[in-house]
């Protein structure tokens, strides 16, 4: 019913809850459940729904991939990367799609208004893809969202070895300082 009514949130919530329940009751049933979602992902022509399926599959493979491909670690890594890339393949479409279509799966957080309640912010956050998120908001002129995306990017991508650098020479501190300098006029930067 949810699929025919395009109630994507209801549909996705049901799929996720179903996979979690199957996994908690009988861990051997995880693979068939994932294969069903993969089949639905392959069949859909709805770009927004395809992105949501890809994000869900990315999360499953990221958390349970070693069980899904126990005989082939590279297969698990390849699937994880494939679904992560597919989840955010159409950044512009995701930026224009409002998450209301996907309720109750997507519950608006405290920053939802900064991102305009769009699907891009949800999927980029779920898959940890902050650079495309930053680029989209920067290009579209949403400086508050670009600032948050840039801060998340620095937080997750600028790596350093603990204790290797003095604070004054830390790549993380330099990157963070640069972001704050660019967006110092915004409340979300401070």
Predicted regions span which residues?
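Extracytoplasmic/secretory-pathway proteins
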Residues: 1-190
């Amino acid at each position: 019913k949810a699929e025919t009514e395009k109630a994507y949130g209801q549909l996705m919530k049901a799929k996720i809850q179903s996979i979690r329940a199957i996994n908690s009751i009988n861990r051997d049933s995880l693979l068939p459940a994932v294969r069903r979602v993969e089949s639905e992902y392959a069949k859909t022509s709805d770009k927004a729904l395809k992105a949501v399926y890809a994000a869900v599959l990315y999360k499953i493979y990221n958390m349970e991939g070693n069980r899904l491909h126990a005989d082939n670690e590279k297969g698990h890594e390849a699937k994880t990367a494939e679904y992560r890339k597919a989840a955010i393949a159409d950044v512009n479409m995701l930026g224009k799609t409002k998450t209301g279509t996907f309720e109750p799966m997507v519950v608006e957080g405290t920053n939802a208004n900064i991102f305009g309640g769009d699907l891009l912010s949800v999927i980029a956050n779920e898959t940890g893809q902050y650079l495309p998120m930053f680029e989209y908001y920067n290009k579209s002129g949403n400086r508050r969202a670009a600032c948050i995306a840039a801060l998340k990017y620095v937080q997750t991508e600028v790596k350093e070895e603990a204790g290797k650098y003095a604070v004054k020479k830390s790549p993380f501190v330099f990157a963070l300082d640069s972001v704050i300098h660019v967006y110092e006029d915004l409340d979300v930067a401070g």
